[in-house]
Amino acid sequence: MLDCRAIILLWLLPWATQGLAVPRSSSPDWAQCQQLSRNLCTLAWSAHTPVGQMDLLREEGEEETKSDVPRIQCGDGCDPQGLKDNSQFCLQRIRQGLVFYKHLLDSDIFTGEPSLLPDSPVDQLHTSLLGLSQLLQPEDHHWETQQMPRLSPSQQWQRSLLRSKILRSLQAFLAIAARVFAHGAATLTEPLVPTA
């Protein structure tokens, strides 16, 4: 009786002999994800430029809120080998982060800000976060969304600090996501096969 590896190799043989790429299930358009993530990085930096000493302050309770913030970690499969083996877990983690930050941009922390007017950097950032998260959502698969933290600062200065903190955290998240998509676009994009 053949073991699983032999069966898989036999199943892949027709594609290998014809020079075809092995079909991937629910694989995103890596090049489009790369372009959108680059755009998001640029928008995140234009939405939050460092403002003197404010960015150097360490907000009280910062360590407590770090556990709520989505991070791409080693076990998420976003490393080159993890992406090659099965990119879905990594893409799910990135999508969860994008949705998390989109909800934060929708929150009262950012409401009433002149920077949220249509076509402002934060508004464009919000729209692009939504676009990339939808691109990562396979049509036939619905991922769970995590519980969103409740942030309701009562004072204007608290909102300003939280906005700064959220945008800095978003910049770091997007930088890592952009690296993942750049690697995916360079190595995981299926080659076009000429039709005869």
UniProtKB/Swiss-Prot annotation:
<dbReference type="GO" id="GO:0032733">
    <property type="term" value="P:positive regulation of interleukin-10 production"/>
</dbReference>
<dbReference type="GO" id="GO:0051135">
    <property type="term" value="P:positive regulation of NK T cell activation"/>
</dbReference>
<dbReference type="GO" id="GO:2000330">
    <property type="term" value="P:positive regulation of T-helper 17 cell lineage commitment"/>
</dbReference>
<dbReference type="GO" id="GO:0097696">
    <property type="term" value="P:cell surface receptor signaling pathway via STAT"/>
</dbReference>
<dbReference type="GO" id="GO:0042104">
    <property type="term" value="P:positive regulation of activated T cell proliferation"/>
</dbReference>
<comment type="function">
    <text>Associates with IL12B to form the pro-inflammatory cytokine IL-23 that plays different roles in innate and adaptive immunity. Released by antigen-presenting cells such as dendritic cells or macrophages, binds to a heterodimeric receptor complex composed of IL12RB1 and IL23R to activate JAK2 and TYK2 which then phosphorylate the receptor to form a docking site leading to the phosphorylation of STAT3 and STAT4. This process leads to activation of several pathways including p38 MAPK or NF-kappa-B and promotes the production of pro-inflammatory cytokines such as interleukin-17A/IL17A.</text>
</comment>
<keyword id="KW-1015">Disulfide bond</keyword>
<dbReference type="GO" id="GO:0045087">
    <property type="term" value="P:innate immune response"/>
</dbReference>
<dbReference type="GO" id="GO:0045672">
    <property type="term" value="P:positive regulation of osteoclast differentiation"/>
</dbReference>
<dbReference type="GO" id="GO:0042102">
    <property type="term" value="P:positive regulation of T cell proliferation"/>
</dbReference>
<keyword id="KW-0051">Antiviral defense</keyword>
<dbReference type="GO" id="GO:0051142">
    <property type="term" value="P:positive regulation of NK T cell proliferation"/>
</dbReference>
<dbReference type="GO" id="GO:0070743">
    <property type="term" value="C:interleukin-23 complex"/>
</dbReference>
<dbReference type="GO" id="GO:0002230">
    <property type="term" value="P:positive regulation of defense response to virus by host"/>
</dbReference>
<keyword id="KW-0202">Cytokine</keyword>
<dbReference type="InterPro" id="IPR010831">
    <property type="entry name" value="IL-23_alpha"/>
</dbReference>
<keyword id="KW-0797">Tissue remodeling</keyword>
<dbReference type="GO" id="GO:0032760">
    <property type="term" value="P:positive regulation of tumor necrosis factor production"/>
</dbReference>
<dbReference type="GO" id="GO:0005125">
    <property type="term" value="F:cytokine activity"/>
</dbReference>
<dbReference type="GO" id="GO:0045944">
    <property type="term" value="P:positive regulation of transcription by RNA polymerase II"/>
</dbReference>
<protein>
    <recommendedName>
        <fullName>Interleukin-23 subunit alpha</fullName>
    </recommendedName>
</protein>
<dbReference type="GO" id="GO:0032729">
    <property type="term" value="P:positive regulation of type II interferon production"/>
</dbReference>
<comment type="similarity">
    <text>Belongs to the IL-6 superfamily.</text>
</comment>
<dbReference type="GO" id="GO:0006954">
    <property type="term" value="P:inflammatory response"/>
</dbReference>
<dbReference type="InterPro" id="IPR009079">
    <property type="entry name" value="4_helix_cytokine-like_core"/>
</dbReference>
<comment type="subunit">
    <text>Heterodimer with IL12B; disulfide-linked. The heterodimer is known as interleukin IL-23. Interacts with IL23R; this interaction enables recruitment of IL12RB1.</text>
</comment>
<keyword id="KW-0732">Signal</keyword>
<keyword id="KW-0391">Immunity</keyword>
<keyword id="KW-0964">Secreted</keyword>
<keyword id="KW-0395">Inflammatory response</keyword>
<dbReference type="GO" id="GO:0001916">
    <property type="term" value="P:positive regulation of T cell mediated cytotoxicity"/>
</dbReference>
<keyword id="KW-0399">Innate immunity</keyword>
<dbReference type="GO" id="GO:0048771">
    <property type="term" value="P:tissue remodeling"/>
</dbReference>
<dbReference type="GO" id="GO:2000318">
    <property type="term" value="P:positive regulation of T-helper 17 type immune response"/>
</dbReference>
<dbReference type="GO" id="GO:0005615">
    <property type="term" value="C:extracellular space"/>
</dbReference>
<feature type="signal peptide">
    <location>
        <begin position="1"/>
        <end position="21"/>
    </location>
</feature>
<dbReference type="GO" id="GO:0032819">
    <property type="term" value="P:positive regulation of natural killer cell proliferation"/>
</dbReference>
<dbReference type="GO" id="GO:0042098">
    <property type="term" value="P:T cell proliferation"/>
</dbReference>
<dbReference type="Pfam" id="PF16649">
    <property type="entry name" value="IL23"/>
</dbReference>
<dbReference type="GO" id="GO:0032693">
    <property type="term" value="P:negative regulation of interleukin-10 production"/>
</dbReference>
<dbReference type="GO" id="GO:0032740">
    <property type="term" value="P:positive regulation of interleukin-17 production"/>
</dbReference>
<dbReference type="GO" id="GO:0090023">
    <property type="term" value="P:positive regulation of neutrophil chemotaxis"/>
</dbReference>
